[in-house]
Amino acid sequence: MTSLIMDMNRLNLDKLKHENIFSDNIIEDAKEFIFGSRKIYTDSVDDLIELYSLAKYLNNQTLKDVVIERMDYVCKYIGKDNWSTIYSFYKENGLRNSFLRQYINNNIEEICSTDQFLKLDVDSVCDILDNDEIVVTREYTILNMVLRWLENKRVNIDDFTKVMFVIRFKFITYSELTNAIEKIAPEYRQRLQDLYHKKLRVLDIL
């Protein structure tokens, strides 16, 4: 049975190479893994992502596991230029990596200054910022990160509310709130003020 699956993989790889669905280098790397040394040495994040896509196409769990293992290693050298690509890989595939999370938490201000951060969807922004381990000196810093992200897009009021819930308003002064309201589009201003007072009322009750 195993031999039959391996033969099917070989046929699939040859077919994919012929049809140019995956790059020739990735096809050869997969062949080397499946039929050769069974190791992956590349440190290219893009190549690993393509290999993982190929593993999913072939439904080859062993290849998936090896790609993840290699990506976990590459993640130890994550930096400003590739954090977004690595983050997206783990998030889109339902995976977690503690080193990635630690890097984001410790370098959140640098990360949020990148163009890649501005391109994230609302779920990703919430996932990144809704974490008590983030290293910042003031909660207003997080609020400014959200405001910067909002400057580059228009989201509906539900998504606006969702992303604002990552802010711990109990650490935001009314003066800081006023400054924030002046920075955002008019359609969001009343909603932000309402959220601020609503959260404070909840805290008073508790």
From Swiss-Prot:
Keyword annotations from UniProtKB, A to Z: Early protein
Gene (name only): OPG030
Induction annotation: Expressed in the early phase of the viral replicative cycle.
PANTHER family hit by this protein: KELCH-LIKE PROTEIN 22 (PTHR45632:SF5), LD33804P (PTHR45632)
Family affiliation: Belongs to the orthopoxvirus OPG030 family.
BACK domain location: 99-181
Pfam families: BACK
Annotated protein name in UniProt: Protein OPG030
